[in-house]
Structures are given as structure tokens and as C-alpha cells.
């Protein structure tokens, strides 16, 4: 069981280290971290590269949260004959967000983890994920400077 926990955490962290904003920036021949706020998240991508790049970044970061947890749930845990341990899903989700926020290969400077956390929530309970997404969008539209860019 301890080995399964360690494997879930390591795989989750490494999966989270995939920086969609950084990759989108590189495709556009820039280092996104050299612009705006200096992080590789969706908002900085929106302000630097526009809506299409931001949507790709947001979806990529959210999907890695969703896939990271489900990878532990449906691949890693069954390989270790571990069933129904929801706390392992939570630990894996936490590791994915940590990997997103603090990727080792970018000097431990990544995004803020909003989209990735949303993906983790969707992995646990998709209905709750929809409610959280609706609340987030309402708050974003009414309180954020980023809403002006949408």
C-alpha cells in the first residue's frame, strides 16, 4: 500500500509538471514566463497570446487534473490491487496541482493551479465540478480584470 501511495504521488506530480501554457508559448516562439505576470497559467497566456491560446491552456491544465486523478484511480491502484481508497485520489490530485504550481524543470515556477484544481474536482464529482465552474465564471465576470480581456 505504501508503494502505491508513493507511485500515485510521483506520477501525479510528474503529470502536473506538464505546463500547457509554457508549451503553447513555445509553439508561438516565446517563453510565456518572460511576459505579463511571469507565470505559465491561463490568465497570463490570455493577456500575452490571446483567447485561443488561453482556451487551449485552460483546457490542457484542466484535463491534466482530471486525467491525473483517473490515472491513479483506474490504472495505478488496480495494478497494486488497491480498491476504493478515495484518499489516494485526493493525494494524487494534490500532487498534480503541486506539479502544476511548482514544476521542477521550470525552476519550481508554474501556474496558479485554478484550472488544474477544477479538473481534479471534476474527477471526483462531475456535478460538483459544474457547480464550481459556474460559481468561478460568475466571480470571474463580475470581479476580475481578466474578464475585460474575454
Regions found by a protein language model. Give the residues of each.
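Alpha-helical transmembrane segments in multi-pass membrane proteins
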Residues: 8, 12, 17, 21, ...
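Cytosolic, membrane-interface loops and tails of multi-pass inner-membrane proteins
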Residues: 22-52
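Short, non-helical or kinked segments that cap or interrupt transmembrane helices
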Residues: 31-42, 105-118, 145
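Helix-boundary and loop/linker segments of multi-pass membrane transporters
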Residues: 43-47, 81-83, 109
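Interfacial segments of multi-pass membrane proteins
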Residues: 46-51, 72-76, 113-141
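Conserved small/polar residues in nucleotide/adenosyl-binding loops
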Residues: 142-150
Amino acid at each position: 500500500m505504501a508503494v502505491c501511495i508513493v507511485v500515485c504521488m510521483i506520477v501525479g506530480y510528474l503529470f502536473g509538471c506538464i505546463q500547457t501554457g509554457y508549451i503553447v508559448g513555445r509553439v508561438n516562439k516565446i517563453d510565456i514566463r518572460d511576459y505579463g505576470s511571469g507565470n505559465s497559467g491561463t490568465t497570463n497566456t490570455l493577456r500575452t497570446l490571446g483567447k485561443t491560446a488561453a482556451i487551449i491552456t485552460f483546457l490542457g491544465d484542466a484535463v491534466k487534473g482530471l486525467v491525473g486523478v483517473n490515472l491513479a484511480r483506474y490504472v495505478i491502484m488496480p495494478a497494486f490491487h488497491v480498491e476504493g481508497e478515495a484518499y489516494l485520489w485526493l493525494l494524487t490530485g494534490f500532487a498534480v496541482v503541486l506539479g502544476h504550481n511548482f514544476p521542477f524543470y521550470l525552476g519550481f515556477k508554474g501556474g496558479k493551479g485554478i484550472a488544474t484544481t477544477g479538473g481534479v474536482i471534476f474527477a471526483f464529482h462531475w456535478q460538483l465540478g459544474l457547480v464550481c465552474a459556474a460559481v468561478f465564471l460568475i466571480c470571474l465576470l463580475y470581479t476580475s480584470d481578466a474578464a475585460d480581456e474575454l
